[in-house]
Amino acid sequence: MAITARTNGVTTAEAYAAGYKGLRDFTENSYLFAAGDWRQDRFSGYDKQMTEAIGYGRRLVDSARQALSVEGGIGAKQSTLINGTDLDEGIVRGGLDYVLHISESSQFNQKFLIEQGDDNRYSESNSALKAKLVGNLALVLSYVIKNNSDVPVGIAKTDRFTAISIEYGF
């Protein structure tokens, strides 16, 4: 993911993120996961944040119309503040993923992630409305709220942004 915004020629937002989560089912509704995330946000107070986590997930609802999963796990986080200070900490990770199929060609997604460490709590909420355009292309309207509980003085703890994007599904 890459997000940038400019107002009157001045950059007001610049964030990049990449991640991967692998799942291994061991019953119809239970699974183990391994996840890794990298985030770089110029205006968050953190130069970069990387996390690795393993844990357990449970599908509470899994029907043709909707799905709800919750996850919990443990891991590690490596962060670099904008002043160059490095922070390494263990984390507890929790997540929620909800999907509502509105029609054959549209759906609503709500994802929530929290990573609690000794030094910082990171949380992210992502609400998205996805509409199929043609073939594997879809239009996605999303609203994201990101929060770091411990940031340098003068930096906002919470960042919000709205995005309109085109998504290609495999």
PLM regions and their residue ranges:
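Repeated loop/turn-to-beta-strand initiation elements of outer-membrane beta-barrel proteins
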Residues: 29-32, 64-68, 102-108, 131-141
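Membrane-embedded beta-strands of outer-membrane beta-barrel proteins
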Residues: 18-20, 54, 94-96, 127, ...
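Membrane-embedded beta-strand positions of outer-membrane beta-barrel proteins
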Residues: 1, 34-36, 70-72, 94, ...
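Transmembrane beta-strands of outer-membrane beta-barrel pores
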Residues: 1-7, 36-42, 58-60, 74-80, ...
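Outer-membrane beta-barrel "beta-signal"
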Residues: 53, 129-132, 158-170
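Solvent-exposed loop/turn segments connecting transmembrane beta-strands
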Residues: 6-14, 40-48, 82-88, 115-124, ...
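Detector for outer-membrane/organellar transmembrane beta-barrel domains
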Residues: 53, 59, 63-115
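Outer-membrane beta-barrel proteins
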Residues: 21-28, 57-62, 78-80, 100-104, ...
